[in-house]
Amino acid sequence: MRKLFTSESVTEGHPDKICDQISDAVLDAILDKDPNGRVACETAVTTGMVMVMGEISTKCYVDIPKLVRETIRGIGYDRAKYGFDCETCSVITSIDEQSVDIAMGVDEALESKKGEMDKLDAVGAGDQGMMFGFATNETKEYMPMPIEMAHKLSRRLSEVRKNGTLPYLRPDGKTQVTVEYENGKPVRIDAIVISTQHGPEVYLEQIEKDIKEHVIKVIVPSELLDENTKYFINPTGRFVVGGPQGDSGLTGRKIIVDTYGGYGRHGGGAFSGKDPTKVDRSAAYAARWVAKNLVAAGVADKLEIQLAYAIGVAKPVSISVDTFGTGKMTDEEIVSIVNKVFDLRPGAIIRDLDLRRPIYKQVAAYGHFGRTDIDVPWERLDKVEEIKKHI
């Protein structure tokens, strides 16, 4: 049976991604000085303006306007002709402390209040909700091919802009990849869409030629392309006005880009700007860690795990898995292995993945999962042998 599946990615200069990176830059700066700081930082950008808001409880001081300007400069919006300039944009901040009602549940979980003395029971989940983790062996990154390929194309767009290969490119851009599957296995790429911001001096014909030569051919294996592969490069014909001048941006608006490109389910919670007591982030990372190690251990070819939490309670209220018919054992047996090998209380996740560190801005663009260009703890295959002992 043949079917098509499509996923998209965006570059670091996309307005929503600018916001994610600013929010995580603030988080990293606080965790660098105060590992126990509580952060829920949201950012909005529009023409000539950045607003940073949220709830932060910390003992340290960070210069938020300076962080904002440094982040925007690093992305590449450093001159007025790009429509957004790190030096001249206004920066507005509105920061409150974390609610004492939320802090009460996070600082002392329900289990601790009942007298259960395990130290890790003292950290309650920062909110209710469900989080999903996913892994598949269809790529070496254990990610679905459509999102993995889209991210690589987006990163390459940024690379050729910054290294001068295509100096007329500007920071905003999007990619989209359609993969054809046969009996559940990726066999070819059916379509590639790339929209990239550019200077007014260059014509579409040149952009099409350069993107095919310096981006697509460099990233996409030739055996996945054929005479029927369709290419759509700047299909509107012109993309000069972009970034915050073209569209407003908000933190947390690219949650599918951040995860599995729609191939796996999503619990709805965004990642950026949240410290690891927020299970939206830490439990989603843990779920990816669990799923990837299970697939690498041979438990299934494709696996999705759902974790659910109650605010102020340490232990997950439910754990479930789905192997989409590829499992080598029953779902109940897999959940049993998960409970034996992994401790999924928030305090244990923070400990085992060492999450109270400034490691978040680096994943705020080009995906939080499947990263091989950086070392993030939830991508490590450090539980495979232990899982195999229980198979």
From Swiss-Prot:
Q: Name one GO molecular function term.
A: magnesium ion binding
Q: How does it assemble?
A: Homotetramer; dimer of dimers.
Q: In which residues is ATP bound? A: H14, D172, G173, K174, R238, F239, D247, R253, K254, A270, K274
Function noted in UniProt = Catalyzes the formation of S-adenosylmethionine (AdoMet) from methionine and ATP. The overall synthetic reaction is composed of two sequential steps, AdoMet formation and the subsequent tripolyphosphate hydrolysis which occurs prior to release of AdoMet from the enzyme.
Which family does the similarity line name?
Belongs to the AdoMet synthase family.
Subcellular location, record wording: Cytoplasm
Region (Flexible loop): which ranges? 98-108
Mention one GO biological process in which this protein takes part, according to its record: S-adenosylmethionine biosynthetic process
Q: Which NCBIfam families match?
A: metK
Q: What metabolic or biological pathway is this protein involved in?
A: Amino-acid biosynthesis; S-adenosyl-L-methionine biosynthesis; S-adenosyl-L-methionine from L-methionine: step 1/1
Cofactor, free-text remark: Binds 2 divalent ions per subunit.
Query: What organism is the protein native to?
Result: Clostridium botulinum (strain Hall / ATCC 3502 / NCTC 13319 / Type A)
Question: Where, in this chain's numbering, is Mg(2+) bound?
Answer: D16
Q: Give EC number(s), comma-separated.
A: 2.5.1.6
Enzyme class, broadest EC rank? transferase
* Protein name (database record): S-adenosylmethionine synthase
What cofactor(s) does the depicted protein rely on?
Answer: Mg(2+); K(+)
**Could you tell me which InterPro entries the record lists for this protein?**
ADOMET_SYNTHASE_CS, S-AdoMet_synt_C, S-AdoMet_synt_central, S-AdoMet_synt_N, S-AdoMet_synthetase, S-AdoMet_synthetase_sfam
Q: Which reaction does it catalyse?
A: L-methionine + ATP + H2O = S-adenosyl-L-methionine + phosphate + diphosphate
One GO cellular component, as annotated? cytosol
- The residues the record assigns to binding L-methionine are E55, Q98, D247, K278
Main subcellular localisation: cytoplasm
